[in-house]
Amino acid sequence: MKTLIRKFSRTAITVVLVILAFIAIFNAWVYYTESPWTRDARFSADVVAIAPDVSGLITQVNVHDNQLVKKGQVLFTIDQPRYQKALEEAQADVAYYQVLAQEKRQEAGRRNRLGVQAMSREEIDQANNVLQTVLHQLAKAQATRDLAKLDLERTVIRAPADGWVTNLNVYTGEFITRGSTAVALVKQNSFYVLAYMEETKLEGVRPGYRAEITPLGSNKVLKGTVDSVAAGVTNASSTSDDKGMATIDSNLEWVRLAQRVPVRIRLDNQQENIWPAGTTATVVVTGKQDRDESQDSFFRKMAHRLREFG
């Protein structure tokens, strides 16, 4: 009888342990698969594509690739002598038309004072018309001078903000055209994370929720806050024909891949450029508050580790 009881007890204990283990593993698996997290996340930053507003030879490059620069710092200079001469020519035109306008103003004033008693109305009108023409030419010359001055100022390319010069593509002696991108500037203190969450996990993502960011290849966990969720994404299976009618591609009904939606996460602390824009990370949205690691069970900790490997 005692032997039977011991066998039954061992069997019952084994069954209970198996059930408990199954429940624990099942909960860990559900937490791993359904909680709001993704390994498809990228560090991003505000990037300014710097292009000159004038064309010409590059006469001086003042920075090197990946250098941290301050707002207003000179990056490179374009052919100033040419634009200086253009400004001097425009200034000479302004001076000429100013003198000519003064002469025509005096002539028109003299004829208007003499009146029709001394000359015909046609001669008076002609003097007034010549004056107006010269004044218009003076205004045009002044506008040309102002543009020449602006072009000269813009031969010096300056940093529009504090940040890092990257992908520097200009060298002294090269000819650069107006509007062609010469360098990119990654703004300092503008880093954030874009986490591409599956649509099935968006229920647990809200603006203001806390998030943990683990850069790929690092054990350091950064903290952040969900800033916003994208309002829409492109439907790759839907296009329009030449009449504007929707064209929907056929999908396999038994295979439905979850669409990924960008979620923008604001970092609590800027990390400078330790993790450059474009590098990857794992993101876990923990809810309204940060996760208390001391309260995590063994299986939950295992689920967190699983996220790093798939």
From Swiss-Prot:
Location in the cell = Cell inner membrane
Q: Please give the GO cellular component terms listed in this UniProt entry.
A: plasma membrane
**Highest taxon of the lineage:** Bacteria
Tell me yes or no: is Transmembrane among this UniProt entry's keywords. Answer: yes
Where does the UniProt annotation place the signal sequence? none
A GO molecular-function annotation: transmembrane transporter activity
InterPro entries in the record: CusB-like_dom_1, CusB_D23, MFP_Efflux_Pump, PHBA_efflux_pump_AaeA, RND_pump_MFP
- An example Pfam family from this entry, by short name, is CusB_dom_1
Q: Which Gene3D superfamilies match?
A: 2.40.30.170, 2.40.50.100
HAMAP family, A to Z? AaeA (MF_01544)
What role does this protein play?
Forms an efflux pump with AaeB.
Mind telling me what this protein is named? p-hydroxybenzoic acid efflux pump subunit AaeA
- Organism taxonomic ancestry: Bacteria, Pseudomonadati, Pseudomonadota, Gammaproteobacteria, Enterobacterales
